Amino acid sequence: MGGRVEALPRSFGVLLAFGFGAAAAAPLPAQTDAHLQHSLDSLVQGFHGTVGIYAQSLKSGHRAGVNADSVFPTASMIKVPILIATFDAMERGQLDFRQELTYTDSLLYAGDDILGAARDSSRFPLNKLTLLSITTSDNTASLWLQALAGGGAAINQWLSDHGFSVTRVNSRTPGREENRAQYGWGQTTPREMADLLVRIREGKAVGPAASEEMYRHLTRSYWTGEALSQLPPWVQVASKVGAVDHSRSEVALVNAPSGDYVFSVITKDQADTTWDPPNEGWVLIRKVSALLWSHFEPRHPWHPAPGAERFKP
């Protein structure tokens, strides 16, 4: 089964039709990195599912992508806009970073979450919820934050007001039941998800001080086995992973020696629904991350040490 790649807009460069083994060229815009575009196109061929990728150097503006503006499930990447909306509520005085909150069993989202193991009536500061949501991808903490930030409708209003036309919270959001049935908790595009991290990096999501702390949160990921595994551990990276049965995803902004770059990789309709490291979606994310490091940092070659996979969660 060949990789299914949806058509890109003409402004993005290449129309691919892997199902028929053919590709029709379209004019490349000035900022498209033709070499990187070719490398990404080659990398996704044969993938058993649909792939979306967006990559951009923040220094040069050069970019490339595959299905960069197509709609994909966010899975746990939706926790990035939830984080932004939570900090926006803090900025407006509706929440406080240090305020104490009481956990009740009714908040539990069944799974392996740290917060879900807490006793009823336990107390937590808001900043521990944001930490758990981003660092360990705790679902119970994230759904609690979604409610504290005003719910999915309020988060979606922030996204709409700030120019994000596709990225939306679907779960527990009235009127978005059909979207939830198709995409799950949230939906986005590779380009929009990358842009969310860029807004935070540039201090333009909420205010500069809030953006700084959000960025610190995003650089503390527990999940180092995919995109992060292909990057030197001494290089700072802000990232968020996501996964559901038929989709794997990760967005990362790399503070590389030669200049920042951002990328987002999302799959959908994956044939491989296994949860082990060889999952085809995880493998693709690792390959994209390694390719981008080599492309943007040719003077700083790096590869994981033999056996590094033994020390990944």
Go through the PLM ranges and name each one.
Residues 108-144, 152, 183:
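Conserved catalytic neighborhood of penicillin-recognizing serine enzymes
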Residues 58-59, 97-114, 149-150, 176, ...:
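Acidic helix-start/capping segments at beta-turn-to-alpha-helix junctions
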Residues 130, 143-202:
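Mid-domain, small-residue-enriched loop/turn segments at the edges of structured enzyme/sensor domains
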Residues 28-43, 148, 152, 195-225, ...:
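Structured C-terminal helix/loop/strand segments within mature extracytoplasmic catalytic/sensor domains
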Residues 11-23:
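Bacterial N-terminal signal peptides
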Residues 88-107, 152, 207-210:
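Short, well-structured active-site flanking segments
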Residues 61, 73-101, 133, 263:
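Active-site SXXK
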Residues 26-73, 291:
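Beta-lactamase-like hydrolase cores
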